């Protein structure tokens, strides 16, 4: 079991992780809590499976079967194409030839294996996860293979993301919000369900295990490169992964063996839904006002989060500000070009979000926002799915129930209770 305490970014209160803590006991409100680990220098434990080799900086009390870890390597193909001398790619997905064994094809597995191994006194209840698709697929795999009761809430339009190599354990149930809904609607549904005593929220960005699981991408990169990178590139839907990268970076500064710089967070959003980009470029901590109907439609198109952890203390605005980072807006055409470029130069298929990150790196080079001799970490958040599906027959999980957006909360509660009888 990892030795750590939780700490509030707002008031500095330190407290034990006893009851699936998601907030400071002082109820600071708009602030993230974080894990303060007793071991300040990271020891990579190669004798532990997958992700858990980084357990010194993961809030876990056990290991689970089946995890894979991010894999970092120095690029030759893409780096040569872009004229970069020190480009390192951190690959999350399925690419056995590189040692990447995430069978859902995305770094959401890093979150799921960390969250499900966290101290939990609620094991007799059902964890609820709201997702736009990839996170749900990852949690479904982890919980199915480790017999952990789980209820997933996703927009029905994202149902194609719910594939797996084999049928899911009956302990995993799936409910969806009707077509035309988005991730925020799935979150709203999950909140209604969590009013029932039988269910508890996974927590999203507020869950320290989710963020520190994501942060293993940086642990992989820094321990492979031997120093903290100068720049960090990633596409973001909610910004949680970039927040996690910032937090991991600061732990390495305390570690003292890898440098004392903060890598500049260079994060990107996919046009047309760019609320964080718009706020950042306007110099605003608060997200800018937008018509709810327009936001719903745009977010639905790319399965994005209308209410990201951008403004709160310790959120993406603070991370970008402290690191001197920047944001990019990338079109679908640019993202597709990024996907094609990566597969041509590196030899593996990547997901659209990763294509957005590649496109943002191209844009940054073109505009002179980064130096060609800088040490750059490119976080490929998903890849190898086409390869996995070619090598394996997959099955799709259909919703156990689909709810209209105007469904009465009591009806929702009665329906989901029946799923776990």
PLM regions and their residue ranges:
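PLP-dependent amino-acid enzyme catalytic core
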Residues: 1-421
């Amino acid at each position: 079991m990892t030795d750590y305490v939780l700490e509030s970014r707002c008031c500095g209160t330190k407290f034990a992780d006893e009851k699936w803590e998601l907030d400071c006991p002082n109820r600071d409100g708009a602030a993230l809590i974080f894990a303060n680990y007793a071991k300040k220098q990271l020891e990579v434990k190669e004798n532990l499976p997958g992700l858990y080799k980084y357990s010194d900086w993961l809030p876990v009390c056990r290991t689970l079967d089946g995890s894979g870890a991010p894999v970092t390597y120095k690029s030759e193909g893409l780096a040569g194409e872009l004229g970069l001398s020190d480009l390192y790619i951190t690959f999350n997905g399925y690419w056995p030839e590189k040692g990447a064994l995430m069978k859902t094809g995305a770094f959401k597995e890093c979150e799921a294996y960390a969250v499900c191994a966290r101290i939990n006194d609620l094991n007799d209840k059902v964890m609820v996860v709201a997702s736009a698709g990839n996170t749900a697929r990852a949690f479904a795999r982890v919980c199915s293979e480790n017999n952990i009761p789980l209820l997933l809430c996703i927009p029905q339009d994202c149902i194609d993301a719910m594939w797996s190599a084999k049928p899911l354990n009956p302990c995993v149930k799936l409910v969806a919000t009707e077509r035309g809904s988005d991730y925020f609607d799935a979150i709203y549904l999950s909140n209604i369900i969590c009013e029932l005593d039988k269910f508890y929220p996974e927590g999203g960005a507020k869950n320290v295990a989710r963020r520190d699981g994501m942060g293993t991408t940086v642990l992989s990169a820094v321990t492979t490169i031997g120093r903290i990178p100068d720049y960090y590139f990633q596409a973001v839907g909610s910004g949680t992964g970039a927040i996690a990268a910032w937090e991991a970076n600061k732990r390495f500064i305390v570690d003292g063996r890898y440098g004392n710089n903060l890598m500049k967070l260079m994060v990107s959003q996919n046009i047309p839904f760019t609320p964080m980009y718009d706020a950042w470029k306007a110099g605003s901590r608060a997200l800018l006002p937008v018509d709810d109907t327009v936001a719903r439609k745009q977010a639905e198109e790319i399965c994005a989060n209308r209410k990201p952890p951008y403004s709160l203390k310790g959120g993406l605005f603070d991370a970008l500000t402290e690191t001197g980072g920047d944001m990019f807006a990338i079109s679908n055409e640019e993202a597709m070009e990024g996907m094609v470029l990566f597969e041509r130069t590196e030899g593996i298929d990547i997901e659209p979000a990763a294509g957005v990150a590649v496109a943002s790196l191209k844009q940054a080079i073109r505009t002179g926002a980064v130096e060609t001799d800088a040490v750059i970490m490119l976080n490929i958040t998903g890849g190898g799915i086409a390869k996995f599906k070619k090598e394996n027959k997959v099955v799709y999980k259909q919703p156990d129930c689909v709810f209209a957006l105007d469904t009465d909360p009591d009806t929702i509660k009665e329906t989901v209770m029946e799923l776990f009888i």
